[in-house]
């Protein structure tokens, strides 16, 4: 096992949990037996192995002794454990006065993900919004906020976009609908600027943008917007966030729900135009916006 130097607390916790499960299975221990050894309920063992709970130093050493882990492997796993309990505040901690708990959890996954898949049926995804578009959406969105809060939330959204330029950058697969391109958010001029920005993404290798045209019919319909994150710790997607008018985002990490949304994203992708054809459609709509400005 190699510990990635820039592994964040969330990814480290999930990776350590996976390793603990492998060790338990290898030694033939049940979760109940491990819980008895630690002096805790089986639910704690389950949460440790799922990466939903940080492993304390005391529990870590107890588990390493139980599984008879050699010194080299123990040192690697200890590094993961220490990373998983790091308390360095993330950059968005400075915006806690306007960021909800759901949004903070979303930002945590976004910050540590290696791959993101997002579907938006009516709006442009946040990581590829222009500042003018983001301001219009935030000002007239479902949340009633004042001018100062709008400024702060837009600042957060612009800062989030640094993930696309980091090393290594976040890999993004975006699927939007033609409606997302035609709704004149902020007016024709703002929308045209947004469309031009989307066209510039053709030069960004880690961003894939595809559009579901109106003539895709029912194949391009879904119940709403959602985002899938993969941290690269294990195979597939780790978590999903579903947008809701009432709670803003609903977090799901149970495998069944995540796999269902991953399949839905694949279906939506199959209904979308290829990237070049999507760019052609965006160019066409941008010209229409120019004439109506």
Each language-model region and where it sits:
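The short coil/loop that forms the "turn" connecting the two helices of the helix-turn-helix
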Residues: 29, 40-41
